[in-house]
Curated annotation (Swiss-Prot):
Subcellular location: Cytoplasm, Cytosol; Mitochondrion; Cell membrane
Name used for this protein in its record: Creatine kinase B-type
Residues the entry annotates as binding creatine: V72, E232, S285
Function in brief: Reversibly catalyzes the transfer of phosphate between ATP and various phosphogens (e.g. creatine phosphate). Creatine kinase isoenzymes play a central role in energy transduction in tissues with large, fluctuating energy demands, such as skeletal muscle, heart, brain and spermatozoa. Acts as a key regulator of adaptive thermogenesis as part of the futile creatine cycle: localizes to the mitochondria of thermogenic fat cells and acts by mediating phosphorylation of creatine to initiate a futile cycle of creatine phosphorylation and dephosphorylation.
Main location as per UniProt: cytoplasm
Enzyme class: transferase
Signal peptide span: none
Cystine crosslinks: none
């Protein structure tokens, strides 16, 4: 398990080749990048909080691959991980984020007025719309590496900040450990709450230690603005509602997020961010905006079409099953969202989803009438 530094010194008694993990059957980004030479070069290093290379890669060693998506296979334990282990993380980031270079700069745009349209996605097809991101609080270790005290301090800070929100963002906090089993399951089934920590990716990285201590969910009174505390990231901020008004969802998201950041700053805390990687999060796949704008969309015909995957790829979108990353589609309903996180601004990513979903609906309508969709095939974005 992560968080043990004396153990790292112990390991160094063995030569690097004796400690190098067997990655022969692995299909993840870490396994593509990590060579015995790189392992030998980085294994003795650690961040100021004691996070090591072996801590970073453990989840990818224990989880060779995923049937639906290519996993990353490495996590950060603190803000410095991306710097201390940059020789591992930079190629992973480049591979994962479409050639993003170590010299590239990330751009942020949380002004919902810059989004064109998006308030009229057809509710006959779009069942719900959702935008989420993560935020990490500077000065604390990230979930794979944080201590109980750090986790509890993050919970306390977050709850204090969130309780200052007012208007339609005002709400309350529900600590996981004080929820009944039934309450918890209801929130999970309604897609409001993260699952119990059964995901091997969470378990192997050390993120599920001490569960459910200092974990919880804050949401406003009508459950359209939610904040998860201490799951994979310090904070996961989510705006969601039924139907196809992505503009409204994104506007609430930007307003709430900006207010939360201001509240943290008033307590002398800021979010981890730098000009190259944007917002720093636990998993390299979420760097940059950390943003996933998604819709649950009914595509019974297009979902079975041989060109469906190609269409999504060209639109820079990805599909997941109805229940999230580890699930299959039920009743022709897919969770469709932006594939990118880094190198595009928040507005650009939501725009891609809005424009792409409109085209998917047009294609579905064509197929309903038994007509071809070849002339609607998009160019690569």
């Amino acid at each position: 398990m992560p968080f043990s530094n004396s153990h790292n010194t112990q390991k160094l008694r063995f030569p690097a080749e004796d400690e190098f993990p067997d990655l022969s059957s692995h299909n993840n980004h870490m396994a593509k990048v990590l060579t015995p030479e790189l392992y030998a070069e980085l294994r003795a290093k650690c961040t100021p909080s004691g996070f090591t290379l072996d801590d970073a890669i453990q989840t990818g060693v224990d989880n060779p691959g995923h049937p639906y998506i290519m996993t990353v296979g490495a996590v950060a334990g603190d803000e410095e991980s991306y710097d201390v282990f940059k020789d591992l993380f930079d190629p992973i980031i480049e591979d994962r984020h479409g050639g993003y270079q170590p010299s590239d700069e990330h751009k942020t745009d949380l002004n919902p007025d810059n989004l064109q349209g998006g308030d009229d996605l057809d509710p006959n097809y779009v069942l719900s719309s959702r935008v989420r991101t993560g935020r990490s609080i500077r000065g604390f270790c990230l979930p794979p590496h944080c201590s109980r005290g750090e986790r509890r301090a993050i919970e306390k800070l977050a709850v204090e900040a969130l309780s200052s929100l007012d208007g339609d963002l005002s709400g309350r906090y529900y600590a996981l450990k004080s929820m009944t089993e039934a309450e918890q399951q209801q929130l999970i089934d309604d897609h409001f709450l993260f699952d119990k920590p059964v995901s091997p990716l969470l378990l192997a990285s050390g993120m599920a230690r001490d569960w459910p201590d200092a974990r919880g969910i804050w949401h406003n009174d009508n459950k359209t603005f939610l904040v998860w505390i201490n799951e994979e990231d310090h904070l996961r901020v989510i705006s969601m509602q039924k139907g196809g008004n992505m503009k409204e969802v994104f506007t609430r998201f930007c307003t709430g997020l900006t207010q939360i950041e201001t509240l943290f700053k008033s307590k002398n805390y800021e979010f981890m961010w730098n000009p190259h990687l944007g917002y720093i999060l636990t998993c390299p796949s979420n760097l940059g905006t950390g943003l996933r704008a998604g819709v649950h969309i009914k595509l019974p015909h297009l979902g079975k079409h041989e060109k469906f995957s190609e269409v999504l790829k060209r639109l820079r979108l990805q599909k997941r099953g109805t229940g999230g990353v580890d699930t299959a589609a039920v009743g022709g309903v897919f969770d469709v969202s932006n594939a990118d996180r880094l190198g595009f601004s928040e507005v650009e990513l939501v725009q891609m989803v809005v424009d792409g979903v409109k085209l998917l609906i047009e294609m579905e309508q064509r197929l309903e009438q038994g007509q071809p969709i070849d002339d609607l095939m998009p160019a690569q974005k």
